[in-house]
Amino acid sequence: MKLFVFKSKDEFLGIESDYVHRIIDDSKVAPVPLTPESYTGLLYHRGELFDVINMRLLLGYPAAEGSAETTRIIIIKWLDKKLAVIPDEITGMIWIDDNSKNTN
């Protein structure tokens, strides 16, 4: 299995690469009132509407201080579900053997 890996604060997270639709640079995200802090808002991209989640805040970490780098947004699609997530950093791809056993 091929995993797309990204980082939020000190945690590395992965998602099957088949579900990563695209990565976009900073786009206008419309805030939605009365939502949890981790819910950044709504993104309208290429005719589709995506909920945007800040992974750092979702994991319970404080918001990142202003970054010099452009924010990247990962657009994820699975069946009829769509979501956009904001990681701190995109680290790359790794291969995981489907037959290996987790020893943790």
Each language-model region and where it sits:
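An acidic, low-aromatic, low-complexity terminal/linker signal
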Residues: M1-N104
